[in-house]
Amino acid sequence: MKKKLLCIALAFVFTVGLGLTAQAEDLALPAPSCILMEKDTGQILYEENAHEKLRPASVTKIMTLLLVMEALDNGSIGWDDTVTTSAAAAAKGGSQIYLEENEQLPLREMLKSVVVSSANDCACALAEHVAGSEAAFVSRMNDRAAELGMTDTHFVNCTGLDDGPDADTH
């Protein structure tokens, strides 16, 4: 009799939840947009305002750093290069390490300053070192973004500083 009751109780416990469905809580993220993608399949798992145009801010520096690292990888620049700060780089606002015009730093130190301090003056100086001018570097940024399938992205500078109505990406 005890075995029958135990079997009935266990059957009840294990089957009661079968008819229930799980529902995830609505996410309340403190971000204006987001997207979550499964890396192997590319399936979008969650998105909110994923195609809304937003100011890229310092996320732009990820592309800047990618191009600098690719230039290092292909040998067009070297870790031991000395980078000279132009007037344009020294005049960048926002986050910076306050470089002065014609100030020279090792490429390695400039790169660290971009990564650690989000230094706009260093990002600009590196862009000029890689491509000759910030404008030429930004053209490379947009070409690379297209190669990566970033079809809704348009860079206007190497820093992400707000340069007017065309400075957007998503």
Per-region residue spans from a language model:
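Intrinsically disordered, low-complexity sequence elements enriched in Ser/Thr/Gly/Pro
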Residues: M1-K2, M37
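Active-site-adjacent loops and short helices of periplasmic peptidoglycan-processing enzymes
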Residues: A22-H170
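Sec-dependent N-terminal signal peptides of Gram-positive bacterial secreted proteins and lipoproteins
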Residues: K2-A24
